[in-house]
Curated annotation (Swiss-Prot):
<dbReference type="GO" id="GO:0003713">
    <property type="term" value="F:transcription coactivator activity"/>
</dbReference>
<dbReference type="GO" id="GO:0006366">
    <property type="term" value="P:transcription by RNA polymerase II"/>
</dbReference>
<feature type="short sequence motif" description="LXXLL motif 4">
    <location>
        <begin position="555"/>
        <end position="559"/>
    </location>
</feature>
<keyword id="KW-0010">Activator</keyword>
<keyword id="KW-0539">Nucleus</keyword>
<dbReference type="GO" id="GO:0000151">
    <property type="term" value="C:ubiquitin ligase complex"/>
</dbReference>
<dbReference type="GO" id="GO:0004402">
    <property type="term" value="F:histone acetyltransferase activity"/>
</dbReference>
<feature type="short sequence motif" description="LXXLL motif 2">
    <location>
        <begin position="344"/>
        <end position="348"/>
    </location>
</feature>
<protein>
    <recommendedName>
        <fullName>Mediator of RNA polymerase II transcription subunit 24</fullName>
    </recommendedName>
</protein>
<dbReference type="GO" id="GO:0046966">
    <property type="term" value="F:nuclear thyroid hormone receptor binding"/>
</dbReference>
<dbReference type="GO" id="GO:0060261">
    <property type="term" value="P:positive regulation of transcription initiation by RNA polymerase II"/>
</dbReference>
<dbReference type="GO" id="GO:0045893">
    <property type="term" value="P:positive regulation of DNA-templated transcription"/>
</dbReference>
<dbReference type="InterPro" id="IPR021429">
    <property type="entry name" value="Mediator_Med24"/>
</dbReference>
<feature type="modified residue" description="Phosphoserine">
    <location>
        <position position="860"/>
    </location>
</feature>
<feature type="short sequence motif" description="LXXLL motif 1">
    <location>
        <begin position="128"/>
        <end position="132"/>
    </location>
</feature>
<dbReference type="GO" id="GO:0016567">
    <property type="term" value="P:protein ubiquitination"/>
</dbReference>
<dbReference type="GO" id="GO:0016592">
    <property type="term" value="C:mediator complex"/>
</dbReference>
Amino acid sequence: MKVVNLKQAILQAWKERWSDYQWAINMKKFFPKGATWDILNLAEALLEQAMIGPSPNPLILSYLKYAISSQMVSYSSVLTAISKFDDFSRDLCVQALLDIMDMFCDRLSCHGKAEECIGLCRALLSALHWLLRCTAASAERLQEGLEAGSAVTGEKQLALCLQCLEKTLSSTKNRALLHIAKLEEASSWTAIEHCLLKLGEILANLSNPQLRSQAEHCGTLIRSIPTMLSVHSEQLHKTGFPTIHALILLEGTMNLTGEMQPLVEQLMMVKRMQHIPTPLFVLEIWKACFVGLIESPEGTQELKWTAFTYLKIPQVLVKLKKYFHGDKDFTEDVNCAFEFLLKLTPLLDKADQRCNCDCTNFLLQECNKQGLLSEASFASLVSKRTADRDPQLKSSENANIQPNPGLILRAEPTVTNILKTMDADHSKSPEGLLGVLGHMLSGKSLDLLLAAAAATGKLKSFARKFINLNEFTTHGSGESTKTASVRALLFDISFLMLCHVAQTYGSEVILSESSSGEEVPFFETWMQTCMPEEGKILNPDHPCFRPDSTKVESLVALLNNSSEMKLVQMKWHEACLSISAAILEILNAWENGVLAFESIQKITDNIKGKVCSLAVCAVAWLVAHVRMLGLDEREKSLQMIRQLAGPLYSENTLQFYNERVVIMNSILEHMCADVLQQTATQIKFPSTGVDTMPYWNLLPPKRPIKEVLTDIFAKVLEKGWVDSRSIHILDTLLHMGGVYWFCNNLIKELLKETRKEHTLRAVQLLYSIFCLDMQQVTLVLLGHILPGLLTDSSKWHSLMDPPGTALAKLAVWCALSSYSSHKGQASSRQKKRHREDIEDYISLFPVEDMQPSKLMRLLSSNEDDASILSSPTDRSMNSSLSASQLHTVNMRDPLNRVLANLFLLISSVLGSRTAGPHTQFVQWFMEECVDCLEQDSRGSILQFMPFTTVSELVKVSAMSSPKVVLAITDLSLPLGRQVAAKAIAAL
């Protein structure tokens, strides 16, 4: 039907003076069913006829108002029609249009299709642009009127415009619709921003303060539309944040060599999720560092903590600085954190007493050097600490003992110098290089240098240089006795250092990412196949322990007949590989009575008399051999280990022997620890006065590990923070019981908790404990434990508040952390996932879209959930279609599969006819997702949520807010915007 007929109908009504309801009845008679009034452009036609003269036609306007009230026309068609009027000089027409907008601008709605809802968003954007243009025109007229002395009309119209603007923008729902429209039509939004700037310039000269403040308020509301989702309130009432504390302790204790970026991202993630103010965030990092310094065991661990605090954490803060806007603000926050820290005098005094120095002063100097503090702040903080410091500490400081912080800070440049020295050609000045390495072995120099290298990310480079040196010394040709002894020493020192690094910092530091064509260096080969490590079982009959028999025979003869080991032309790597078979020959001879104990003593002296590496290789094989022997067969092998670890009975003739023996004994003690515990044997290693393995064998004997787990968690919860020892016990339990056992039992403990403040603390602590292996724990928690709780009605009671809220919070935190980091590198402390685990997830959540997963078959027992199992051939709005599918996320990844299936389960729970604690749990889960989100949900875990879930969620009263809808939908996708517009327009 043509518009001309519509126009004729309107004119006929006007001529015959029909009342509004009479007009509506006749209109429905004139126009048959089928075409809607919006398609016929009724609103536009009525406005066109009403606005022909200098003043609006009241009768035709009454028809339009009736059409709006009776929903003959949609709000979007009326707004679009209004925004086409641009003769702002006709005051009465403008006022009439503002009156019409005033009727409905704060109660817009649309219950039609998604396209119609998007149409409403666009129409509202056009109407906002029209209102701004109208306001600007009114303000200009007011200024002209002021100059001419007749300002009353202009002021009245401007007041009406601002009133309508304020009423439209005060509605959160309208701002949410405008947020969607802005993403749909970026050019229109740019026009609005230009209009806003122009309006600001005009209104700046306005004398009426009330109108000016009203205009400023409207401007603020418009400018807030693009950032609607980024406003979070920070927790200003809290002072302790155990998650940050535990994360720092975990990194400092177990992951000194880890890269900084993953730690920085994890800290920022926790800061965002828990809304921690920056000064308190930095303060918590410092507090954890000082606690670590105080409680770290003496020796290597103490040096590791010192390096972590003084070298790594300042660098971490430098990286964190980039996440904050404005350097000045961040330095003020760091200064504020130190101001708070200085009030914790007992903590700082205890650290000073432990480290034999003013720890805070060293830290302030380092932060000042890194540009984290201004000079004025630095001077002020130093003077405050000096004034507050316990005077007895200064007098009790031992001038003969150099404090660790000072030593570590001096060790850092030394590491760089050593790396440069190691780059030189080894063949030119081996004696000079030996001198450098000899100094490294004295006292605690080696551990200091390694800690400094680990904290600054140079340890891998350090190890690589020593592997190259070790490789260089394996062969000697045409050498003198002196050259041969230097070569032997360089081989020995590099070998011992590399073993020490592998045991202290993990073997992954040593391993290179060598390409398939390259030859693997000797030390790497030996370490991977022959070196005992915790949890690594070696086969004593492995081919690596069975080299060429002629080499073995000559080595046995050399050990048995010579008074001492020969050095010239000695191929040390071959000797190291042959020693295991030689030891087996010697053991057999001893057991069969061919050799006496005195001969064994002479042989063991020969083995360790010149080159300690041979003793290390011998014990490595003996440890593997002892495991395979019966109780009554072990004595001789253990006796031989004792001999190799004991003092030398003959004279040693090579340099740095005592220093090398100290490292050798530490290596042997680490190697033998597991087997000695399993065989209930004791071997006394020469003591250095320091516990070389402070965190080994912490589990109490003869107690079930579940008891140990619940006990340690109860203690940690009571205390409110995790200490280093507890971290190591929990790590041992995780590897002993497995991820499912560990996670399941800790979640059971959380669900037992009924005190609200305790559940929140438990969540913060559990999250940090789960960081021991966050990826694996998240897969278990979201893929097994939560589905089990949500699908079993007998367990629903455990999801009541407060433990249910706490579990929802924990699940979201784990999901967000794992998802944000799983594309990056896994932390070096996290064990690599086995292939079969991945297969488990594939079978639980199959790859093929057409094949419903085990989990979804389980859910489809609900009679009203069959739609979930429909095959996604209809891609327009299938019940399981989510943003992740439109972004083509890799669904072979176990975490992506688990998230997708969890959100399908959530959708199923919301759509089910049975409500209960599980429904409430889903609501808390979604609320936490919204609370933790960044500006938009693209790339977050919510992209796995089916689009259909949005309409189910808004039925839950707590979730029926426009901001929530914006937060949970992926607005970067047209389909996401349609879903959001439909849900918001229906609110």
